[in-house]
């Protein structure tokens, strides 16, 4: 197993035991448990971005195969997950991003187990993702979420992502998404 896959990135807040790492095949059951626990809450709040059928196990297996699925773990318990890749959907071309595709990565399919929501896990995950990307020379993140997904929009805004516009991903004019970008601060170190 390669070192990168097992590398743990300890939170800059100094909270020991919390880390973002690349997912392993053995994590897929827990990823699906989290997904299945958030879907009813999403639907209850009027957000139909995810469903029983999406994202499915095959989607996460593909993310795993592409080495883009990450889990956020604390004391051996996976509390959340996210996909970080360079898959910028074609409609992203219509958004006035500050950064190019080459200079950024896309954040997709992020969730936190409802049992741990409200404890800073989303913020911790986003900070760890940012640290990981900065370390790799990436300058920022592009992302989107359903117009209905107010909780995720709140998380993006709380974590200093800038609203960039609306887009339609599915050619369904009733299904709009909002886009966000975070450009990482340049610390002046080269």
Question: Residue ranges of each PLM-predicted region?
Answer:
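Conserved beta-hairpin
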Residues: 67-85
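A short beta-loop-alpha structural element at the N-terminal edge
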Residues: 19-33
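Conserved acetyl-CoA-binding loop-helix of GNAT-fold acetyltransferases
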Residues: 112, 118-131, 154-158
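C-terminal "cap" of GNAT-fold acetyltransferases
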Residues: 99-103, 158-159, 169-190
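Conserved active-site alpha-helix within GNAT-family acetyltransferase domains
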Residues: 123, 135, 148-165, 173
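Conserved GNAT acetyl-CoA-binding A-motif
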Residues: 126, 133-145
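Conserved GNAT-fold acetyl-CoA-binding loop/helix
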Residues: 39-59
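Conserved acyl-donor/pantetheine-binding loop and adjacent beta-alpha core of acyl/acetyltransferases
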Residues: 83-109, 117
């Amino acid at each position: 197993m390669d070192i990168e896959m097992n590398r743990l990135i300890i939170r800059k807040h100094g909270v020991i035991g919390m880390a973002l790492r690349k997912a392993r095949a053995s994590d897929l059951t827990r990823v699906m448990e989290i997904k299945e626990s958030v879907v009813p809450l999403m639907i209850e709040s009027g957000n139909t971005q995810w469903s029983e059928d999406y994202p499915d196990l095959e989607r996460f297996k593909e993310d795993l195969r592409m080495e883009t699925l990450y889990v956020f773990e604390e004391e051996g318990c996976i509390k959340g997950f996210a996909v970080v890749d360079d898959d910028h959907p074609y409609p992203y071309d219509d958004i006035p991003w500050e950064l190019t595709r080459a200079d950024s990565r896309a954040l997709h399919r992020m969730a936190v187990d409802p049992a741990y929501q409200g404890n800073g896990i989303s913020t911790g995950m986003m900070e760890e993702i940012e640290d990981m990307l900065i370390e790799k020379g990436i300058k920022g993140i592009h992302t989107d979420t359903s117009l209905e997904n107010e909780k995720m929009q709140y998380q993006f805004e709380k974590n200093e992502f800038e609203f960039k516009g609306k887009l339609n991903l599915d050619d369904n004019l009733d299904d709009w998404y909002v886009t966000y970008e975070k450009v990482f601060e340049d610390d002046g170190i080269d």
